[in-house]
């Protein structure tokens, strides 16, 4: 029996050596270590929607790949853990080994979970206990963060941390939820998402922030964010409300001139008064969303653009209805627009024939609406026949100089997506023209969700 086992062990050893010799003859074995490492790194970073590839995969291929992967810290600088009760023990041990292999590389940390109960919170705390031992190497943190973890973060230093997105458990009421006290220990912090936390309890290095996101603020609190953050480039304010119409200040200045991207979601239509209270000359991207019945007037956007003299390039509006007398003056004030997204959540006053005709390059009364538009998305009621709509889209795909002004250059509309929630008739002629445009290279879609 012993001799048989010895023979089997010898055969296994010979098989391993034979496989290594075969592997040494492959083309990949001739690659320099630097190129192989770069291939590994790019594979780990790929975002194709499938399961992520980790360095552990390469370690299971062969001895040479394992040695390369195990000795390359940059392959281990991304930590993505889906926390569960079953895997808690193995995750903590794997994390310790992972951090050792990451060495001094900047760490990109993401912690998620499908469940939010006490056992998961305990697992998160155990994981955070291990992670803070390398707090000096944190580059970003994206995590569900129960209160049980706050004290762990409090007395640590984060010299490399640039981005933080933390959120309390779903059942937490934001009015009573305080964020962790860690941000003043992060001298390089630029990007903060504190959605779900009480604004008055936020202690942040406001002067250095470039991006900020939160929710459930009054108009007055939104203005405080902008005033405290002169370097802010991008701001996302969700669920903004106003107990009463907030009057604009007597004098408007350009204090917020660094802001380029503003995204606001309103709880009450009166909160649109926020736009009447600011001047943003550097604004290039604006999104305003409100689905309430009362709605808001697009004239607030129109006034902001005129007052700011900004070069707005992307405009996204979502509201109950879009009336021509409200929408068209706003669109006429932003000839610089390249991207437009309009969503009408109601069942009336949507994309009109007048709006479509004003976008046509051959309109009689002057240059077309939005001459630089290259991307157009509309969702809602359509008050224009399909022939007129597709004719306009076709002319914008291959535009000629404006009829009454040859100096105006009209950009090619590369993408157009039109969605309606009711039946919309497309004649055979229209469908034929759409197929031709698609074959020619235009990304065109007109569909009904009915």
Model-based region annotation:
Residues 1-450:
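Leucine-rich repeat
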């Amino acid at each position: 029996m012993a001799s048989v086992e010895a023979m089997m062990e010898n055969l296994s050893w010979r098989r391993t050596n034979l496989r290594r010799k075969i592997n040494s003859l492959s083309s990949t074995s001739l690659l320099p270590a630097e190129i192989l490492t770069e291939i590994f790194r790019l594979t780990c970073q790929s975002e194709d929607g499938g399961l992520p590839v980790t360095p552990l995969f390469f370690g299971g291929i062969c001895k040479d790949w394992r040695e390369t992967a195990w000795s390359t810290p940059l392959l281990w600088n991304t930590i993505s853990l889906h926390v569960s009760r079953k895997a808690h023990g193995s995750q903590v041990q794997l994390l310790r080994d992972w951090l050792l292999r990451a060495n001094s590389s900047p760490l990109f940390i993401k912690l998620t979970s499908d469940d939010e109960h006490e056992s998961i919170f305990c697992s998160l705390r155990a994981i955070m206990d291990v992670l803070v031992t390398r707090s000096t190497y944190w580059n970003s943190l994206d995590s569900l963060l129960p209160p049980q973890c706050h004290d762990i973060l409090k007395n640590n230093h984060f010299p490399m941390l640039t981005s933080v997105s933390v959120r309390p458990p779903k059942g937490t009421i934001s009015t009573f939820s305080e964020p962790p006290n860690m941000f003043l220990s992060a001298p390089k912090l630029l990007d903060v998402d504190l959605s779900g936390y009480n604004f008055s309890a936020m202690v942040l290095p406001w002067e250095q922030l470039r991006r900020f996101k939160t929710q459930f603020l009054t108009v007055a609190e939104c203005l405080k964010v902008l005033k405290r953050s002169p370097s802010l480039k991008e701001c996302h304010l969700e669920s903004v409300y106003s107990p009463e119409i907030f009057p604009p200040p007597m004098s408007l200045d350009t204090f917020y001139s660094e802001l380029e991207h503003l995204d606001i979601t309103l709880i009450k239509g009166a909160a649109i008064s926020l736009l009447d209270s600011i001047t943003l000359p550097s604004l290039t991207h604006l999104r305003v969303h409100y689905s309430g019945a009362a709605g808001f007037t697009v004239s607030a956007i129109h006034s902001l653009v005129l007052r700011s003299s900004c070069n707005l390039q992307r405009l996204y509006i979502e509201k109950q209805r879009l009336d021509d007398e409200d929408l068209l003056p706003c669109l006429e004030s932003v000839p610089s627009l390249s991207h437009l997204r309009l969503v009408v959540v109601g069942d009336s006053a949507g994309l009109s024939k007048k709006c479509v005709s004003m976008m046509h390059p051959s309109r009689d009364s002057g240059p077309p609406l939005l001459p630089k538009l290259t991307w157009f998305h509309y969702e809602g009621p359509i008050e224009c026949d399909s022939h007129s709509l597709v004719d306009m889209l076709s002319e914008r795909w291959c535009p000629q100089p404006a009829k009454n002004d040859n100096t105006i250059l009209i950009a090619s509309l590369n993408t157009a997506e039109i969605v309606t929630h009711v039946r919309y008739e497309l004649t055979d002629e229209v469908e034929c023209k759409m197929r031709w445009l698609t074959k020619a290279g235009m990304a065109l879609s007109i569909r009904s969700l009915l």
